[in-house]
Amino acid sequence: MDSNTVSSFQVDCFLWHVRKRFADQELGDAPFLDRLRRDQKSLRGRGSTLGLDIETATRAGKQIVERILEEESDEALKMTIASVPASRYLTDMTLEEMSRDWFMLMPKQKVAGSLCIRMDQAIMDKNITLKANFSVIFDRLETLILLRAFTDEGAIVGEISPLPSLPGHTDEDVKNAIGVLIGGLEWNDNTVRVSETLQRFAWRSSNEDGRPPLPPKQKRKMARTVESEV
């Protein structure tokens, strides 16, 4: 096993522990708490994949961080912070909408890279809006936290979420996953719209209905892909 992989996991475990202590003092805002919860799932998946105990890794990560801080000057810290571009966290959904449980009558699921696409194929003839919470850097989607499909009545009928055991995805990965979700939902004559935030940072183009322009041929192909591969 690569030593950098192990040490990276150890540092991530310790930093998560620090953030958890911060949250326990009721100091974290909603985006902070959301990332904390999802990073916990990711660390559990990575720990299982690597065969490493999280508690032991956390202690080792503390030693690594302490050693770095001992060598770090205030001036170097200022330069590092100034040179790192800041990302923004954008929210279409409330914390309640993100954490709400939902159920599928005819479940369909597809894994595309490090993203999991889920949808209820029993939904027909509905107006559906895609909403997402994600981070943006350089005016492009950086990391998808969660995307969900809502009917006008507020029911959740689809979802795209990162797999905890496979961290890392690009904006193109997200765009392709959204295309698969839209294709599957439109197969049952649903009308799908994309939120303005997603249009701006993930699609960069849309038609008058507020959804990405997908040719009918491509739409049918993606819908068949969902049915054949799930």
From Swiss-Prot:
One of its GO terms (cellular component) is host cell cytoplasm. SUPFAM superfamilies: Ns1 effector domain-like, S15/NS1 RNA-binding domain. Keywords: Eukaryotic host gene expression shutoff by virus, Host cytoplasm, Host gene expression shutoff by virus, Host mRNA suppression by virus, Host nucleus, Host-virus interaction, Inhibition of host innate immune response by virus, Inhibition of host interferon signaling pathway by virus, Inhibition of host PKR by virus, Inhibition of host pre-mRNA processing by virus, Inhibition of host RIG-I by virus, Inhibition of host RLR pathway by virus, Interferon antiviral system evasion, RNA-binding, Ubl conjugation, Viral immunoevasion. Upon interferon induction, ISGylated via host HERC5; this results in the impairment of NS1 interaction with RNA targets due to its inability to form homodimers and to interact with host EIF2AK2/PKR. Inhibits post-transcriptional processing of cellular pre-mRNA, by binding and inhibiting two cellular proteins that are required for the 3'-end processing of cellular pre-mRNAs: the 30 kDa cleavage and polyadenylation specificity factor/CPSF4 and the poly(A)-binding protein 2/PABPN1. In turn, unprocessed 3' end pre-mRNAs accumulate in the host nucleus and are no longer exported to the cytoplasm. Cellular protein synthesis is thereby shut off very early after virus infection. A motif (Nuclear export signal) lies at residues 137-146. It comes from Influenza A virus (strain A/Grey teal/Australia/2/1979 H4N4). Homodimer. Interacts with host TRIM25 (via coiled coil); this interaction specifically inhibits TRIM25 multimerization and TRIM25-mediated RIGI CARD ubiquitination. Interacts with human EIF2AK2/PKR, CPSF4, IVNS1ABP and PABPN1. Belongs to the influenza A viruses NS1 family. The gene is NS. Residues 223-230 are annotated as: PABPN1-binding. This is Non-structural protein 1. The dsRNA-binding region is required for suppression of RNA silencing. Residues 1-73 are annotated as: RNA-binding and homodimerization. Residues 180-215 are annotated as: CPSF4-binding. A motif (Nuclear localization signal) lies at residues 34-38. Residues 205-230 are annotated as: Disordered. GO terms for molecular function: protein serine/threonine kinase inhibitor activity; RNA binding.
